[in-house]
UniProtKB/Swiss-Prot annotation:
GO terms for biological process: thiamine biosynthetic process. SUPFAM superfamilies: Ribokinase-like (SSF53613). It comes from Treponema pallidum (strain Nichols). GO terms for molecular function: ATP binding; hydroxymethylpyrimidine kinase activity; metal ion binding; phosphomethylpyrimidine kinase activity; pyridoxal kinase activity. This is Putative pyridoxine kinase. Belongs to the ThiD family. One of its GO terms (cellular component) is cytosol. The lineage of its organism: Bacteria, Pseudomonadati, Spirochaetota, Spirochaetia, Spirochaetales.
């Protein structure tokens, strides 16, 4: 059995974060384990605004100790790391257990909170985790933060961001554009392996029920790597997986909706 570890925030709505990751791992026929670094809630009395409740260092460390015990972990993904101790713990355990496949989803802002994480946390993530990443999966805002450029608005700017991020240490870079580029009629992302740029395109699903799509694609990439796929093939599989889920998306509450991940069955089953 392939064992996968997701490290990140729990989303009380169930659509994103650890909850999305574990659903994704299950769809790939893998056994998912989790380490929570924070819990994200939504307040319906305040227009569904989000709050991030970080967990203490001992709690994070004890979970990592449990997750890595016993049967070896095939691949690891990290998402929301909203504290210095969470970032440092993840870096420590990646090194201690010589993790060969690591997907770094550099969550720098929580949708609905309106606030980016503290700049010093972003810099610490880049310093400690980016050089360890088999694949890093920034969105356009995160690409700008890591690469030190303006938010990309064209494919060429996405490529430049990917190149600069690769220079900072990541083995492979997957810049998630989705449908956010001006005039874009497809869900378009850029993959860079240090030598070649690949455009990864699929249908742009306009339902609006896309909460957790970024978490899901990085989790699916993690599952693909854990299954032995190359980084590029894992990304192609993840793209199909997410698009299929979004086609069958549904409303979770008055604020968000999410993709129906059960509508897709990968060839690994």
């Amino acid at each position: 059995m392939v064992k996968l570890l997701s490290i990140g925030g729990s989303d009380a709505s169930g659509g994103a974060g650890i909850e999305a990751d574990l659903k994704t791992f299950q769809e790939y026929g893998a056994f998912g384990v989790a380490t929570l670094t924070a819990i994200v809630t939504m307040d319906p009395s305040r227009n569904w605004s989000h709050r991030v409740h970080s967990l203490e260092e001992d709690c994070v460390r004890d979970q990592l100790e449990t997750a890595f015990a016993g049967v070896g972990v095939s691949a690891v993904k990290s998402g929301m790391l909203a504290s210095v101790h969470a970032i440092e713990c993840v870096a420590e355990y990646l090194e201690r257990f010589a993790v060969a496949a690591y997907v770094f989803d550099p969550v720098m802002v929580c949708k609905g909170s309106g606030d980016a994480l503290h700049r010093e946390l972003n810099e610490l993530m880049i310093q400690k985790l980016l050089p360890r990443a088999t694949v890093v999966t920034p969105n356009l805002f995160e690409t700008a933060q890591i690469a030190g450029i303006s938010v990309p608005r064209t494919v060429d700017e996405m490529k430049e961001g990917a190149r600069l991020i690769h220079e900072r240490g990541a083995s492979h870079v997957f810049v998630k554009g989705g449908g956010r580029l001006p005039g874009c009629k497809h869900a378009l992302d850029v993959f860079y392996d240090g030598k070649t740029f690949h455009l990864v395109e699929d249908e742009l699903v306009q339902s609006g029920w896309n909460h957790g799509a970024g978490c899901t694609v990085s989790a699916a990439i993690t599952a693909g790597l854990g299954r032995g796929l190359t980084a590029y093939d894992a990304i192609l599989s993840a793209k199909r997986f997410v698009t299929t889920g979004l086609r069958h998306g549904f409303q979770v509450n008055q604020w968000v909706g999410t993709g129906n991940l059960s509508k897709w069955r990968d060839r690994f089953h």
